[in-house]
């Protein structure tokens, strides 16, 4: 994916040195080299708090907690993005599989993959997303 850094489809500029300083090694490898964090190890796998999940690279709001569900796959799963404009999808033929890669539409950061085995009563989709690609902003509690 590092070859996509200067792709004009992604308006958010990325400086490699700045990203390496700002991101953890896992965040960098996941978002910039399409690595996958080990299952059941991500910070947000079991998070149930209300809020919004943002791209760790550029801050774009990607998923709402109301679209999150427990899939048992080991990564945070959502049945839809916050809107259709925040996600870029690309065919992925790596590792001997055919999958649909999911990227942030603003910066091109690798987020994970989308599969057609999500909740049938919703969209039927499962956005399987690396916690390392996300920052969570909790919804303020009402007093």
From Swiss-Prot:
Q: Catalytic center at which residues? A: 128 (nucleophile)
Q: Give the UniProt record's GO annotations in the biological process aspect.
A: protein repair; response to oxidative stress
Annotated MsrB domain residues: 16-139
Q: Does the keyword Metal-binding apply?
A: yes
Could you tell me what reaction this enzyme catalyses? L-methionyl-[protein] + [thioredoxin]-disulfide + H2O = L-methionyl-(R)-S-oxide-[protein] + [thioredoxin]-dithiol
Q: Which Gene3D superfamilies match?
A: Peptide methionine sulfoxide reductase
Q: Name one GO molecular function term.
A: zinc ion binding
Q: Cite the EC number.
A: 1.8.4.12
Answer yes or no on keyword Thylakoid: no
Q: Which GO terms describe its cellular component?
A: cytoplasm
Among SUPFAM superfamilies, the record links this protein to: Mss4-like
Task: Kindly list the cysteine pairs connected by disulfide bridges.
Answer: none
Matches recorded under Pfam families: SelR
The Swiss-Prot or TrEMBL record lists the needed cofactor(s) as: Zn(2+)
Q: Which UniProt keywords apply?
A: Metal-binding, Oxidoreductase, Zinc
Q: Which residues does the annotation say bind Zn(2+)?
A: 55, 58, 104, 107
Q: How is the cofactor bound?
A: Binds 1 zinc ion per subunit. The zinc ion is important for the structural integrity of the protein.
Q: What class of enzyme is it?
A: oxidoreductase
The record's similarity note reads: Belongs to the MsrB Met sulfoxide reductase family.
Q: Entry's PANTHER family?
A: METHIONINE SULFOXIDE REDUCTASE, METHIONINE-R-SULFOXIDE REDUCTASE B1
Q: What is this protein called?
A: Peptide methionine sulfoxide reductase MsrB
By which gene is this protein encoded?
Answer: msrB
């Amino acid at each position: 994916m590092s070859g996509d850094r200067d792709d004009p489809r992604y308006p958010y500029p990325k400086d490699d040195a700045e990203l390496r300083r700002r991101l953890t090694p896992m965040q960098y490898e996941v978002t910039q080299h399409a690595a996958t964090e080990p299952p059941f190890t991500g910070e947000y796998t079991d998070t149930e708090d209300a809020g919004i999940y943002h791209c760790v690279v550029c801050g774009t709001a990607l998923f709402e907690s109301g679209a999150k569900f427990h899939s048992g796959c080991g990564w945070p799963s959502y049945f839809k993005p916050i809107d259709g404009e925040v996600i870029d999808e690309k065919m992925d033929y790596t590792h001997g599989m055919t999958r649909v890669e999911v990227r942030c539409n603003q910066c091109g950061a690798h987020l994970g993959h989308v599969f057609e085995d999500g909740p049938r009563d919703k969209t039927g989709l499962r956005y399987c997303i690396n916690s390392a690609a996300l920052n969570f902003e909790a919804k303020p509690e009402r007093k």
